[in-house]
């Protein structure tokens, strides 16, 4: 199942590619967006050069109808069990680590986020190829892209928006001023003459915190259906400072530069563990 915003859709698609490598008849189901629009809706095929195989209406209905009677939901840490007729598999608790056996799940309907590179490490090259941005940049963004590739550019992602709303704030508001200050200091200590490019849904907040050095550029102008352009531009930077956000996770992961430094918060959520979400070659910075 494909659901939620762009970054999460990308994790789910990457999981699909890994599954399809083992089970050639794997299909996606993005029908949830017809009934429950989220963020900018289903975006994968609009933004990237991907052509996943979609489950048909009959296939989806058959799964849903049968599910009322015999689907078993497995939330256990150890993973899942096989049934002769099939099964609904809900992602095991990510706080206990990833579940490699799921890559060989047969006759299953899988729901989850699958937020770790470990699920698709063996098909990483294919995932990178698939996540080629379809649309050319406009003249203004192309000029910025050229700068990013020529300078020792550092993308910094600050996500506030939905993260500071009362119902999510306690768990999601992880990337503090101190996190960004430590990240900037780390980059300055390890990179000669870095240029920081800040991508944020609240640039005013970033400017008011006195975190960033003189010459920092705050990138703006990409909202709504064009928000993905921020990810595209982030991926062109030399180095990355990400938020606890799947959006900036992919902005960093898609980068192709050599000797890249990627800094990530040591805590993804305040009250939930995510031990596998940060790749081994990224550097964790204390977020408290």
Regions found by a protein language model. Name each.
Residues 37-49, 206-214, 274-279:
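Short, aromatic/basic amphipathic alpha-helical patches
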Residues 6, 185-272:
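Donor-binding and catalytic core of enzymes assembling or modifying cell-surface/extracellular glycoconjugates
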Residues 38-191:
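Secretory-pathway luminal glycosyltransferase catalytic domains
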Residues 25-36:
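A short beta-strand-loop structural module common to alpha/beta enzyme folds
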Residues 2-11:
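A short, glycine/small-residue-rich beta-strand->loop->alpha-helix junction that serves as a flexible
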Residues 270-288:
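Leloir-type glycosyltransferase catalytic cores
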Residues 12-19:
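Short amphipathic alpha-helix
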Residues 27, 155, 195-197:
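A structural signal for isolated positions on well-ordered beta-strands in alpha/beta enzyme cores
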């Amino acid at each position: 199942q494909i659901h939620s915003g762009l970054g999460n859709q990308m994790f789910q698609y990457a999981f699909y590619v890994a599954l399809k490598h083992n089970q050639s008849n794997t299909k996606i189901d993005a029908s949830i967006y017809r009934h429950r629009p989220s963020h900018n809706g289903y975006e994968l095929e609009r933004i990237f050069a991907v052509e996943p195989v979609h489950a048909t209406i009959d296939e989806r209905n058959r799964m849903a109808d049968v599910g009322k009677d015999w689907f078993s939901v497995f939330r256990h840490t150890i993973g899942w069990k096989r049934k002769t007729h099939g099964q609904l598999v809900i992602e095991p608790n990510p706080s206990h680590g990833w579940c490699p056996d799921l890559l060989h799940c047969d006759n299953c309907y899988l729901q989850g986020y699958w937020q770790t590179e470990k699920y698709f490490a063996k098909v990483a090259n294919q995932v990178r190829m698939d996540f080629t941005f379809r649309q050319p940049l406009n003249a203004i963004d192309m000029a910025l892209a050229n700068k990013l590739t020529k300078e020792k550019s550092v993308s910094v992602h600050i996500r506030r928006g939905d993260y500071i709303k009362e119902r999510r704030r306690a768990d999601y508001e992880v990337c503090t001023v101190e996190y960004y200050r430590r990240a900037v200091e780390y980059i300055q200590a390890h990179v000669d003459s870095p240029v920081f490019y800040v991508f944020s849904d609240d640039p005013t907040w970033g400017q008011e915190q006195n975190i960033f050095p003189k010459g920092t550029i705050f990138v703006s102008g990409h909202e709504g259906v064009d928000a993905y352009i921020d990810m595209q531009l982030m991926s062109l930077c030399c180095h990355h400072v990400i938020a606890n956000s799947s959006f900036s996770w992919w902005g960093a992961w898609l980068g192709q530069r050599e000797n890249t430094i990627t800094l990530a918060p040591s805590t993804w959520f305040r009250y939930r563990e995510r031990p596998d979400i940060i790749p081994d070659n990224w550097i964790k910075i204390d977020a408290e």
